Amino acid sequence: MCQLKSCLVLKDRVFCPDYNSHQQMLEELGIEDDYLHASKTFVRVEFTPPDNTKSLIEPLDRWTLEVDQDIVPEWWDKKADRQRVEEAVEIWRKRHVFTGGKHIVTTGTVYAYGDAEVHAYNDATVAAYDSTIVKAYGNAKVYAFGKTTVETVSNVPVEAYGDATVKAYGNTKVEAFDRAIVKAYSNAKVEANGSATVKAFNSATVKAHGNAKVEAFDIAIVKAFDIATVKAYNRAMVIYPEERKIIYPAGWTIETHE
């Protein structure tokens, strides 16, 4: 299964790394994944919160412990070993689950709730909920839910849901759903779905679906589908593929757009 949060229970400790792949855990520890070792050395477990990642801050006694293998060693005691798993996951949670304060992450996956503020760099991934603030740079990835506010620079991909607000710069790619609000600048690319609202500036590119609303400025380009609404200003261009129609900016000529 390898769900969050996966651990490997050994007789003398619980291995609970940043990742959730049991196979990767066994390889890191140099343990063969075979019947002999499964019956004597390790137990794969999944320790999951009641509502997946939305409830990572719930008390650990509400989480569910599942064994992810058919045979277990004789020393395995689900009640006693659950306590060991809880202790290991609590240590992991303190490092990866934020409910307040300002945090800087450069690698791995973290989860932000409440009024936490996260600055993500390099290959870090942030899943943000509630009213959290995320500023992402480099190759970081952001998944925004609730009323999260995200500011992205460079190649950061963002998926925005609920009432999330995103400001995207550089070559950022944004997928917006529900009532998410996006402001896109530079060469940012946005796909807007549901009732998402987008304001596109500079050379931003937008694909709008459903009831999405887009305001396009400068030389932004918008492709509009379904009943999406677009207001275009300056030299922005709107393309309606389903209607085979293009609305050119005022003063547009072949010479000025070659």
Where are these regions (language model features)?
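Short, glycine-biased loop/turn motifs at secondary-structure junctions and
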Residues: 1-258
